[in-house]
Amino acid sequence: MRARGWGRLPRRLLLLLVLCVQATRPMGYFELQLSALRNVNGELLSGACCDGDGRTTRAGGCGRDECDTYVRVCLKEYQAKVTPTGPCSYGYGATPVLGGNSFYLPPAGAAGDRARARSRTGGHQDPGLVVIPFQFAWPRSFTLIVEAWDWDNDTTPDEELLIERVSHAGMINPEDRWKSLHFSGHVAHLELQIRVRCDENYYSATCNKFCRPRNDFFGHYTCDQYGNKACMDGWMGKECKEAVCKQGCNLLHGGCTVPGECRCSYGWQGKFCDECVPYPGCVHGSCVEPWHCDCETNWGGLLCDKDLNYCGSHHPCVNGGTCINAEPDQYLCACPDGYLGKNCERAEHACASNPCANGGSCHEVPSGFECHCPSGWNGPTCALDIDECASNPCAAGGTCVDQVDGFECICPEQWVGATCQLDANECEGKPCLNAFSCKNLIGGYYCDCLPGWKGINCQININDCHGQCQHGGTCKDLVNGYQCVCPRGFGGRHCELEYDKCASSPCRRGGICEDLVDGFRCHCPRGLSGLHCEVDMDLCEPSPCLNGARCYNLEGDYYCACPEDFGGKNCSVPRDTCPGGACRVIDGCGFEAGSRARGVAPSGICGPHGHCVSLPGGNFSCICDSGFTGTYCHENIDDCMGQPCRNGGTCIDEVDSFRCFCPSGWEGELCDINPNDCLPDPCHSRGRCYDLVNDFYCACDDGWKGKTCHSREFQCDAYTCSNGGTCYDSGDTFRCACPPGWKGSTCTIAKNSSCVPNPCVNGGTCVGSGDSFSCICRDGWEGRTCTHNTNDCNPLPCYNGGICVDGVNWFRCECAPGFAGPDCRINIDECQSSPCAYGATCVDEINGYRCSCPPGRSGPRCQEVVIFTRPCWSRGMSFPHGSSWMEDCNSCRCLDGHRDCSKVWCGWKPCLLSGQPSDPSAQCPPGQQCQEKAVGQCLQPPCENWGECTAEEPLPPSTPCQPRSSHLDNNCARLTLRFNRDQVPQGTTVGAICSGIRALPATRAAAHDRLLLLLCDRASSGASAVEVAVSFSPARDLPDSSLIQSTAHAIVAAITQRGNSSLLLAVTEVKVETVVMGGSSTGLLVPVLCSVFSVLWLACVVICVWWTRKRRKERERSRLPRDESANNQWAPLNPIRNPIERPGGSGLGTGGHKDILYQCKNFTPPPRRAGEALPGPAGHGAGGEDEEDEELSRGDGDSPEAEKFISHKFTKDPSCSLGRPARWAPGPKVDNRAVRSTKDVRRAGRE
């Protein structure tokens, strides 16, 4: 035994050693990388040479041997006035000998990572890198002292080997980038880089947040970039130690230690731990609670093993005896005549009682009797009908019906015959409806369908409407075709032609579109502008918010962040903390604990820096600790308000105090002390030293020159001026020309700090450190430049679906309806006001109550008297008037025999792929079958056990409104739900999410008059998003998109309220799309231009036809001879206009024509006298010409028969008359004597 105990001891010590090593692991590292050191003269800080005080150069430098330089680093707490002595409280380090008087090292990069890795393993690290580990929360402020030393193997005291000492007090945050520091000391110039990095598995600005991924007994999680724990699949809880059990497992009676299990508690059993274990030895009983034995019918006793119906279970009496149950497990037999015995087994006159049934003959035998049975019967008393169906005589699946001395086969439709052995000709009944022909098959038939039809009997019209109609057109399915009914403004076979430029709804966010000839115009609502109303106007200038609320611009709207005491759109309505007195049990500083823990639990509403004091009316007040203020004591009082730091010092606000970070050249609590740079003697006793700000000046003795009086020849050397300054030797002194950004006698003072302009936002304080900066953020902000608001709502502090409002260093819980309290932990008891009347019982529910009415009363408050009405029947069940029930996802109510149900399409029923056929939940309705879900429908595994009941045809009506499509119109809205995958329950599918949305009361309320369709699918924008397409059916008479918009927003409002649904609690963002983006109209350019050109071409044709007809009429008129006028004014023009008398006319000689032309030229028409009449027929006076002119003035409206005649009136000299056209008119107005034919005219011309 002793040997065994000593054997265990080394292992225990080894375990303790491992734990100690683990406990001493650092939280982070301070890293310093030396880049360069320049000691031009090879001197020590005392002025002596490194290896003796002999000077060999003419300039006075040390030339016999160079220094063996190495560096020591001391890291300690922040000191306003740096003291080089004292312990290095944060750590220290040193380098090996790096070089001589001056040397350069490679720049810092991955060297720190490599050195840190080698330092852990004990390997060699980069010589110029110093790594100081720390095992405490990094305070961000520090003091760094860097010393350069000369290595000497002799016994020279250390202080005499110091080359240079520089110091830096500042702030630095953990990050990967390096910060550069430059120091110009009395003797040497140093360049180095520093940074702080957290060790692996440590996070935050102080490296004290530990998170190491693990998958063991203590947790199952990974770590994100901020050190937060992210549970692995199948695990939950703060430490991710709680396993997610099998879906359906009764957690009251079981649990699990491995994800997906369901391990039952003591006394429970079954797949889901929902079956109790009965009392041991229970024979004929069951249990409701563990270790009970509830007997079945006819059984009794402690173990239910006593037969209370022995006669019914054993039938002991024979020969027709009647069995009587006497006691448990006891019986008596009442024997018929002729039988005796306990069981009536002995016969005296066996056949006396006619024991043989069904015509059997009885014969007495020594043991009793025997029955000779007729055909078809069997048994001791011929009471058993011989089962002729036992041999399965019916073929082809026929059903056998046993009969007396025979059987009958009930055959399937495809078979006939006595035993269903003949194939029936199913085509005789003409089952095919829309087919070319019917073909009889063995056990069935086949229909050769016409084009456009399908199905077993060709009874299904193939839907040709899938995705045919564009721009929201309604597709009408035809036989082997389709027809698109286009909305207003569109046309074409597929509604692809846009007539109305507003039909595509180009105006966004509620803008009203006006169609113009060359485009459209959007009339934007208040707060919007732009061509498509896409530009937000600043609705917060001036601010509409009252009572000090802050205004935020939203998309087309604004939001007022109201204080606690006010609400409403503009924060103008005072809030009532306890409306209606319903929350009288609520304490302003906490909540009332349950019966098991009496008292009031604190809510933490005042945060870690305040004490809550309850006030009347459920209000509270926060008494803040010193240094804090605000409603929730969340604001740290700014102690830097009065700018206490002097000389450009940076003030850092702390709790009830402040700290000054001084620039180079100043120190002290308020940066009001200029350290003496003349200590120790930088002039090496060769001159007088004068102290400056962050510098010094040496007035050298005769014979010495230089900044430190180190040379006898030159005032300038390569390092007299710092930071790239140029040195000019002026004989007795020197002058430095500093580069941009630096000033001072030797260019040691920076003009522009790295904090100008201030890169830190949200009240952060910038602390410059060389060429970089660090931001000290106010409480509630974090990040390199204080841009990230710390999430005060993580972990979730609000219970029961309350929404956490994250502020700056505070949070507030906005409770779901029915809950109240600082953290929404209290369920408001709506039954406190006794709302139920007439003796009804009030049952408190979440955000409401339910009244259990006495007989004869109904209604929400039992205020209605029940009147005899007709019940409603649904699925074989009767429901009384006024009652409500659920049918799938719809709610129904009975109104005097009429079922009033919501119209929501409930989708496909889930089914268990691995379920037994006897399980009702795993079976599909008739005509449907359980199929696996489509790939990608699982939102949170495992989902492989569940499928969907799918029919041959899709259940929802055909609609173009589908998820993952760009279709939006007056009857289509699209919702995009984003989920926090860590909060989604295991086994959740897209179908389960869709079913949950369909079951919302807001969804059922919207589906009152039309069928509401909600179709879901995974969104293409992300793995944790689901798209929901919302539409109505039918949608033919929808005037606008108001119905679909109100429905979509009602569903979104119900989702954001969340309630107690664990699935809706995981929703982090909801996006609503109800307006189609304005599309390009270039596709309509060609049809529009064609239409314009067609109109222009038609107009040209009409004008050409009109012009041609006009010219034709003018030519016809020019061919007609004109009548003589009263004064012969047309005579001179007659040879020109009369075609009959033109040169070369028919029948006219050349000479005759000249004479006529000569006479016409010398003819002067006399003036017409009043009342002179032309020669005409008797009885015609001056009125004849007027009548003729009147006839001429009628134009072409007279009878066309007048065109058949040519009327001429001649003067005395007919050769000079000018023909005028005359119109034919009936009556005496026509002078037939003046009418001549063309032949007469030609004859007259020859004469």
Swiss-Prot record:
PROSITE patterns listed in its UniProt record? ASX_HYDROXYL, DSL, EGF_1, EGF_2, EGF_3, EGF_CA
List the transmembrane segments: 1083-1103
Q: Which CDD domains match?
A: EGF_CA
Keyword Membrane among record annotations? yes
The Gene Ontology biological process annotation of the record reads: auditory receptor cell fate commitment; cell fate determination; epithelial cell apoptotic process involved in palatal shelf morphogenesis; gamma-delta T cell differentiation; in utero embryonic development; morphogenesis of embryonic epithelium; Notch signaling pathway; odontogenesis of dentin-containing tooth
Q: Name one Pfam family in it.
A: EGF
Q: Which residues carry this modification: Phosphoserine?
A: 1125
Q: Which Gene3D superfamilies match?
A: 2.10.25.140, 2.60.40.3510, Laminin
| SMART domains, per the entry | DSL (SM00051), EGF (SM00181), EGF_CA (SM00179), VWC_out (SM00215)
What sequence ranges are listed for the domain DSL?
196-240
Provide the residue span(s) of the region labelled Disordered.
Answer: 1115-1148, 1167-1247
Question: What PANTHER family does the database record attribute to this sequence?
Answer: CYTOCHROME C OXIDASE POLYPEPTIDE VIC-2, DELTA-LIKE PROTEIN
Q: What is this protein called?
A: Protein jagged-2
Organism annotation:
Mus musculus
Gene it is expressed from = Jag2
